[in-house]
Curated annotation (Swiss-Prot):
The lineage of its organism: Eukaryota, Metazoa, Chordata, Craniata, Vertebrata. InterPro entries: CRK_SH3_C, CRK_SH3_N, SH2, SH2_dom_sf, SH3-like_dom_sf, SH3_domain, Tyrosine-phos_adapter. Its main location: cytoplasm. Phosphorylated on Tyr-214 upon cell adhesion. Results in the negative regulation of the association with SH2- and SH3-binding partners, possibly by the formation of an intramolecular interaction of phosphorylated Tyr-214 with the SH2 domain. This leads finally to the down-regulation of the Crk signaling pathway. Belongs to the CRK family. This is Adapter molecule crk. Residues 125-185, 228-289 form the SH3 domain. Required for apoptosis in Xenopus egg extracts. Involved in cell branching and adhesion. May mediate attachment-induced mapk8 activation, membrane ruffling and cell motility in a Rac-dependent manner. May regulate the efna5-epha3 signaling. Keywords: Cell membrane, Cytoplasm, Membrane, Phosphoprotein, Repeat, SH2 domain, SH3 domain. SUPFAM superfamilies: SH2 domain, SH3-domain. Residues 180-221 are annotated as: Disordered. It is found in: Cytoplasm; Cell membrane. The record marks P230 as: Proline switch. The modification Phosphotyrosine is found at Y214.
Length: 296
C-alpha cells in the first residue's frame, strides 16, 4: 500500500535545520516508513530524508543539482533534486515516487507527527524503557503480551498501574506496571534497543556535523501489487514470535513465504511451511513474480 500523506503539504514533513541525532530522537521507535525531511548541516542547499526502517533510522542525502534558489521568472534555472541515481523536479515529486518505491526496506508511509511532538525535539534521554520482570500473557485485546527479560518502550502513562508500551517488533498495547522495572540502555543516548539508529550515532550539538555515511536507496524497487498475482519472498532474518501470539509466523532464514496481504503498518500476512500468519516485511526479501514452481 502506498503512503497516505500530502506531499505538497511541506509543513507536514519539512523540519528545517536539524542534525542527525535530533532526527533519530524523533524517529526511533516509530513504525516503518515514518519520515521527515531536514536541511543538510554540512552542505547548504541540500536536504536529508530521515526514515524509520528495519529497526533503525536511515538517512538519505538529497543533493540539489544546482544551488540556485532564485525564481525561474527571472530567467534562472530551477534546482533539481537527486537521491541515489534518481533525479526529480521537486521535493514533493521525490516523496511521491518513494510512496510506491522502496528506499531500502520500506516505502514512505507518513511524516512524523509534529502535533504529537508539540514542536519540541524529543531528546533520547527522555525516552523511557522498561524490562519485564515476569511473563505477561495478556487478558484483553488491548494488552501487550511479553516475556520475562523483554525490553519495552513507554508510549503513554494513562493509568497508575497500566501503561501503554511498544515491544521490539513494533507491537503496542497496555502493560501492568508491577510486571516491569525501569531500564536504562547500556549505550550512549545516540543508540536505543527499540528502533535505534544503527549507524554512527554519537550525540552531536545542535546544528553539528553529520556523522557517519548516508544510506543509499534501492534502484527502482516498487511496492508489490497483489492484483498482479501471487507474490513470494525469501526469509533473510530469523524470527521467533512471541509464544502467546498464535497469529505470528515463525521464520527461518531461507524459507519461502507466499505473501497474501500487504498492510501499510509493515506487518504483512502470508503462508510459510503450511502455516498462515503475520510477519514483519523487513524479515524477507521479495523474489521475482510467480516463482510458484519453487513454492512448497
Amino acid at each position: 500500500m502506498a503512503g497516505n500523506f500530502d506531499s505538497e503539504d511541506r509543513a507536514s514533513w519539512y523540519w528545517g535545520k536539524q542534525n542527525r541525532q535530533e532526527a533519530v530522537n524523533l524517529l526511533q521507535g516509530q513504525r516503518h516508513g515514518v519520515f521527515l525531511v531536514r536541511d543538510s548541516t554540512t552542505i547548504p542547499g541540500d536536504y536529508v530524508l530521515s526514515v524509520s526502517e528495519n529497526s533503525k533510522v536511515s538517512h538519505y542525502i538529497i543533493n540539489s543539482v544546482t544551488n540556485n534558489r532564485q525564481s525561474s521568472t527571472a530567467g534562472m534555472v530551477q534546482s533539481r533534486f537527486r537521491i541515489g541515481d534518481q533525479e526529480f523536479d521537486s521535493l514533493p515529486t521525490l516523496l511521491e515516487f518513494y510512496k510506491i518505491h522502496y528506499l531500502d526496506t520500506t516505502t514512505l508511509i507518513e511524516p512524523v507527527s509534529k502535533s504529537k511532538q508539540s514542536g519540541v525535539i524529543q531528546r533520547q534521554e527522555e525516552v523511557e524503557y522498561l524490562r519485564a520482570l515476569f511473563d505477561f500473557i495478556g487478558n484483553d485485546d488491548e494488552d501487550l503480551p511479553f516475556k520475562k527479560g523483554d525490553i519495552l518502550r513507554i508510549r503513554e502513562k494513562p493509568e497508575e498501574q497500566w501503561w501503554n508500551a511498544e515491544d521490539s517488533d513494533g507491537r503496542r498495547g497496555m502493560i501492568p506496571v508491577p510486571y516491569v522495572e525501569k531500564y536504562r540502555p547500556p549505550s550512549s543516548p545516540g543508540s536505543a534497543l527499540i528502533g535505534g539508529n544503527q549507524e554512527n550515532s554519537h550525540p552531536q550539538p545542535l546544528g553539528g556535523p553529520e556523522p557517519g555515511p548516508y544510506a543509499q536507496p534501492s534502484v527502482n524497487t516498487p511496492l508489490p501489487n497483489l492484483q498482479n498475482g501471487p507474490i513470494f519472498a525469501r526469509v533473510i532474518q530469523k524470527r521467533v514470535p512471541n509464544a502467546y501470539d498464535k497469529t505470528a509466523l515463525a521464520l527461518e532464514v531461507g524459507d519461502l513465504v507466499k505473501v497474501t496481504k500487504i498492510n501499510v503498518s509493515g506487518q504483512w500476512e502470508g503462508e510459510c511451511n503450511g502455516k498462515y500468519g503475520h510477519f514483519p516485511f523487513t524479515h524477507v526479501r521479495l523474489l521475482e513474480q510467480n516463482p510458484e514452481e519453487d513454492f512448497s
